[in-house]
């Protein structure tokens, strides 16, 4: 297994309240509404002053690859796009992390990821969820 825990993310300053909320997303382009929901709930948690981390694993990692949203999503009338939801989340300070093992399995490098999206090992997710005030999975 490639995961070497990078616990440096734990030393980053929390939001003023010190509360942590983790959202795990395993859905990708096969279920875009679930990804939109994960991004929406991440934005809501961040707006409630939680330090919010969206951890992407499996199919969700594909969504965080440069150019993938524009290539694969077909926008629908009166429905927010993934890009809109992603931009909202990032503007609110949501931290987005991608599973390094999923990245390795799919030959995705850190340079392939969208700006601001960081690779992170599975042990980091375990540590974060053990400290979180709450978590959701999509």
Predicted regions and their residues:
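Positively charged, low-complexity intrinsically disordered leader regions
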Residues: 2-17
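Short, glycine-rich nucleotide/cofactor-binding loops
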Residues: 16-17, 23-36
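Histidine-anchored nucleotide/phosphate-binding helix
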Residues: 35-50, 54
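Short internal beta-strands
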Residues: 52-57, 96-100
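N-terminal beta-loop-helix "entrance" segment that forms/cooperates
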Residues: 60-73
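A glycine-rich helix N-cap at a beta->alpha junction
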Residues: 71-102
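A short aromatic-anchored loop/beta-hairpin motif
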Residues: 88-89, 97, 106, 110, ...
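Aromatic- and Gly/Pro-rich donor/ligand-binding loops
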Residues: 137-138
């Amino acid at each position: 297994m490639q995961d070497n825990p990078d616990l440096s993310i734990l030393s980053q300053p929390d939001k003023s309240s010190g509360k942590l909320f983790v959202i795990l997303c395993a859905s990708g382009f096969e279920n875009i509404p679930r990804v939109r929901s994960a991004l929406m709930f991440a934005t809501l948690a961040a707006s409630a002053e939680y330090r919010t981390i969206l951890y992407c694993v499996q199919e969700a990692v594909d969504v965080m690859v440069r150019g993938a949203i524009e290539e694969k999503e077909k926008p629908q009338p009166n429905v927010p796009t993934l890009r809109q939801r992603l931009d909202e989340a990032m503007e609110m300070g949501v931290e987005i992390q991608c599973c390094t093992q999923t990245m390795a399995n799919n030959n995705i490098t850190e340079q392939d990821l969208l700006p601001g999206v960081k690779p992170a090992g599975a042990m980091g997710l375990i540590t974060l969820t053990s400290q979180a005030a709450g978590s959701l999975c999509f």
